[in-house]
Amino acid sequence: MPKLLGSFISFKSPHYLVGSVRDAVSIKAQAFMIFLGAPHTALRVDPNRMQIDEGHTLMEQHNLSKSGMVVHAPYIINCASKDPVKQTFAIDVLTREVKLCHAVGAKLIVLHPGSAVEQTQTQALDHLIKVLNTVIANTKEVIICLETMAGKGNEIGRDLDQLKYVINHIEQQERIGVCLDTCHFHDSGNDFNNTAEIMETIDTKLGFEFLKVIHLNESKNVCGSKKDRHANLGEGMIGFDNLMRFIAQPQIKQIPIVLETPSDKHNYPAVYGAEIERIRAWFGAR
């Protein structure tokens, strides 16, 4: 059984962290992932308004560990941009976001690696490395987790070789890791029908010591499609049993596993509660 299983959780006014913890508790989650503001903007409220201490107290009351709390960086930044102005913006936003993570008690922040606009993939990776080393040098403790991407358009991070290249050039490697998104990994060409092959790929190309978070998602598309369209568990092309066999692996079930499957205002957070219950039922039957 996964130790830290949960989902994306809303973080919003007026209750912020307290509201997030309440939602996580309501679906019996052991982990949760939040945006510290709207995903497509850099605007953030003062941390004094985020009800952090009250949220931590509520977490303790419900045995929710801070090791299961994950933050997602805003989508608005492209840390791989060659534009000096956009690089500076990315550094400023990500630095502030990492400091906010530290303030709310999260040790992990997930980041989309960026896009290779008007440059080669390698050039984009080098720009990402520069941004990450700068941000890490100006912050503390929080681990930046580069998310595996599906490979659509000019995205970088479409394979583990690229992410390991970045890791190899980070000056403080204890501050860098990877978030493996199962939908993205499938869409970029990794077949979850073969669990052993998936695990070998992670082991040889990355190393499990750098795998810090799992985004557990189904995919609406075939393997290798490079589409990035999430589906709910049991409704996609990866296969529920394949996903369960993957997260049952000893190297996987000890890290935060977070659902990012589709939800809306009518079924949030209940849809995640139902999926968590289904996952636990699968493990309970074995």
UniProtKB/Swiss-Prot annotation:
InterPro entries associated with the record: AP_endonuc_2, AP_endonuc_F2_Zn_BS, Xyl_isomerase-like_sf, Xyl_isomerase-like_TIM-brl
Cofactor(s) required for function per UniProt: Zn(2+)
Organism expressing this protein natively: Mycoplasma pneumoniae (strain ATCC 29342 / M129 / Subtype 1) (Mycoplasmoides pneumoniae)
Purpose of the protein: Endonuclease IV plays a role in DNA repair. It cleaves phosphodiester bonds at apurinic or apyrimidinic (AP) sites, generating a 3'-hydroxyl group and a 5'-terminal sugar phosphate.
List of residues binding Zn(2+) 2: 147, 181, 215, 260
Xref: Gene3D superfamilies: Divalent-metal-dependent TIM barrel enzymes
Annotated EC: 3.1.21.2
Family: Belongs to the AP endonuclease 2 family.
Protein name: Probable endonuclease 4
